[in-house]
């Protein structure tokens, strides 16, 4: 995507880091400008994703006590062909051999089918299941028909602008306004403060999900 893409512009409101566009080998790419060791570094999306995959690879090797090379990666159903190819590039940078990119709706459907042995025979009426996936940044819904040894994805839909972070954002906006009125400080004027507020609001959201009592918000060293 380019810097003027509506999806990119929508995403910028959630992120404290600086997003820019840079010509790399004749191709205009999005980069993230980050400060590292007193220098500004420009990192592509592929490079950042490769860092995550490298970390996962390291964790896997430590737990399995063996070298991890092959992998299968699940992706949202709305990923474009370009986004899928970029993810494959990230896997290659991380030293991983991606055997297959699988839609997340298909992955969860397979996982469900593997552990259910009471599915109807092939010539019988299928067992219909709806899967609702509320992720951090998106919502995905899929309807799947099951028979023994067989599944069919009947349909999928998504909203890639609705996720758990939208609940965090409501809490963040509330506390940002409250702090500004009571303490004359603006949490959104400082990137570190904004990140701290986001982290605490996410914790608060999780506590609120399972607790109906009054829950305090505690942030140490907020603006410094």
Regions found by a protein language model. Give the residues of each.
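Oxyanion-binding/catalytic loops of NTP- or PPi-dependent enzymes
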Residues: 1-27, 37-51, 58-224
